[in-house]
């Protein structure tokens, strides 16, 4: 089984940051990406388990994978239009 988190186009380490900083950093990073590129987000704020999926829905990005059973949490999103 392949790890979906390998070889993202960009990686964002948001460890040590607390809400709302991780989502603000994700938004800033995604703005600089091209449609279809992937972003690996690494975070340890429990609020990201709600905020990152919600951000993807609201901003119409695709959440390809998430790993939230252990810290640090990992999320992989693909930038939408």
Swiss-Prot record:
PROSITE patterns: UPF0033 (PS01148)
Organism: Pectobacterium atrosepticum (strain SCRI 1043 / ATCC BAA-672)
Localization per record: Cytoplasm
MF (Gene Ontology): sulfur carrier activity
Secretion signal, residue range per the UniProt entry: none
GO term, biological process aspect, one: tRNA wobble position uridine thiolation
Function: Sulfur carrier protein involved in sulfur trafficking in the cell. Part of a sulfur-relay system required for 2-thiolation during synthesis of 2-thiouridine of the modified wobble base 5-methylaminomethyl-2-thiouridine (mnm(5)s(2)U) in tRNA. Interacts with IscS and stimulates its cysteine desulfurase activity. Accepts an activated sulfur from IscS, which is then transferred to TusD, and thus determines the direction of sulfur flow from IscS to 2-thiouridine formation. Also appears to be involved in sulfur transfer for the biosynthesis of molybdopterin.
Gene Ontology cellular component list: cytoplasm
Active-site residues, Swiss-Prot/TrEMBL: 19 (cysteine persulfide intermediate)
Pathway(s): tRNA modification
Family: Belongs to the sulfur carrier protein TusA family.
NCBIfam families registered for this protein in UniProt: PRK00299.1
This protein's name: Sulfur carrier protein TusA
Keywords: Cytoplasm, tRNA processing
Assembly and oligomerization: Interacts with IscS.
Gene transcribed to yield this protein: tusA
